[in-house]
Amino acid sequence: MPSVFVQGRPTASYPPFAPEAGRGAVRRVTEVGEEVLHRPCRDVTEFGPDLAALIDDMFRTMYVAEGAGLAANQVGVDLRLFVYDCPDDEGVRHVGHLVNPVLDALDPAARRLLDEGEGCLSVPGAVMAVPRPDRAVVRGLDKDGVPLLVEGTGYFARCLAHETDHVNGHVYLDRLSGRERKAALRQSADRREEVFARRAANAAAFAA
């Protein structure tokens, strides 16, 4: 089994950070409550240098914020797009981006739900148990408009489902009870200062 998949394809070797991050700039991460996170994003219809530059910025922002995935509306851009650099439960690394992603519906009889911890860069510092299927299949396009299919299991399946939720206008708090949502927001308030200090240090390290 290859140790790295890039854009859903096995790759012999890959650097610690996606090359896109070296070209990108850090953008502000939007937070829960901001309108752009709570409405469905627009389809990407223009493929070109502006889209490529956005992907570069998203990779750099994701690494600085210590995320496994990042959707465009998490940097304030109302487009159906996300990037990811995420391991699965077997330790295989998955890196890439998806434009106009659509999550396949799984046969309920064949799927297994995993009720495990999940966080979000737009709810800084909070982690709550969220049930998600242990497998995900997402179809979309790459930055050049070429069709892509990406499959994930375990933690990577959770990442794919989480990021597809984002472009559909949902955050993981929407999957929690009212009491759990309040607990997550309290966690975020308590840990916010620590999270933002780490992000600032990471941004400085990337710029060095």
Swiss-Prot record:
It is an enzyme of class 3 (hydrolase). It comes from the Bacteria. Its EC number is 3.5.1.88. Binds 1 Fe(2+) ion. It holds the Pfam family Pep_deformylase. The keyword Metal-binding applies. Its cofactor is Fe(2+). GO terms for molecular function: metal ion binding; peptide deformylase activity. The keyword Aminoacyl-tRNA synthetase does not apply. GO terms for biological process: co-translational protein modification; translation. The active site is at E163. It catalyses: N-terminal N-formyl-L-methionyl-[peptide] + H2O = N-terminal L-methionyl-[peptide] + formate. Fe cation binds at C120, H162, H166. Signal peptide: none annotated. Gene3D superfamilies: Peptide deformylase (3.90.45.10). Keywords: Hydrolase, Iron, Metal-binding, Protein biosynthesis. SUPFAM superfamilies: Peptide deformylase. Belongs to the polypeptide deformylase family. Removes the formyl group from the N-terminal Met of newly synthesized proteins. Requires at least a dipeptide for an efficient rate of reaction. N-terminal L-methionine is a prerequisite for activity but the enzyme has broad specificity at other positions. This is Peptide deformylase 3. It comes from Streptomyces coelicolor (strain ATCC BAA-471 / A3(2) / M145).
